[in-house]
Amino acid sequence: MNKNVVIKSLATLTILTSVAGIGTTLVEEVQQTAKAENNVTKIKDTNIFPYTGVVAFNSATGFVVGKNTILTNKHVSKNYKVGDRITAHPNSDKSNGGIYSIKKIINYPGKEDVSVIKVEEHAIERGPKGFNFNDNVTPFKYAAGAKAGDRIKVIGYPHPYKNKYVLHESTGPVMSVEGSSIVYSAHTESGNSGSPVLNSNNELVGIHFASDVKNDDNRNAYGVYFTPEIKRFIAENIDK
């Protein structure tokens, strides 16, 4: 573990699903010594990459990994069922990439908070490029890896109702990578669950799932780092 992350006393983390969905918390023994960054940008045009790779749930975020296939957290997908809807890269009430029905949910069998969701290819409500899901979105590619000190960005829909589904991008440094865990100093909020964690080349490093509840300069965020095993699971469950 990175020397800037010190195991000390109990600090509460929050699973970052909007209060409009679930209000779950978990406990972790972590205290940070580095100051968190608060570099957050509102995205004005969601019809360009990498923003075309992001989707919105009612209370959380997801992102595209292949044909008709998106990724989010287990704690998000457990509140959805076949027939429920997602919206591709909405930009408040200005535009979106179409609205699509969920057709299958597949949870990662390990402890990691990862869930694959397949959607119907034909939109309920069309996007700017027609009714086909794959014409309106852009799948992300994987990064070769990540290490402490690398710059990352988290793109998602914090407080989606309050912010009227405006997409936000938050940036900061990686604090540590250990096994399937990645810790980073980027500002995230409720609703960011399921957001992609990207490197400076907009390549996938992991998926965001939680951050410290405390709102101060030592606040860190937490994601699932994409190990070869997790990448294999995702690849095996992408729509053919």
Curated annotation (Swiss-Prot):
Pfam families according to UniProt: Trypsin
Catalytic residues in the record: H75, D113, S193
GO terms for MF: serine-type endopeptidase activity
Subcellular location: Secreted
Main EC class the enzyme belongs to: hydrolase
GO annotation, cellular component aspect: extracellular region
Signal peptide: 1-36
EC nos: 3.4.21.-
Record keywords: Hydrolase, Protease, Secreted, Serine protease, Signal
Source domain of life: Bacteria
GO biological process, one term: proteolysis
InterPro entries the UniProt entry points to: Peptidase_S1_PA (IPR009003), Peptidase_S1_PA_chymotrypsin (IPR043504), Peptidase_S1B (IPR008256), Peptidase_S1B_tx (IPR008353), Trypsin_dom (IPR001254), V8_his_AS (IPR028301)
UniProt keyword Magnesium, yes or no: no
Family membership noted in the UniProt record: Belongs to the peptidase S1B family.
Function: Serine protease that cleaves specifically after the sequence Trp-Glu-Leu-Gln.
Protein name: Serine protease SplB
Species the sequence originates in: Staphylococcus aureus (strain bovine RF122 / ET3-1)
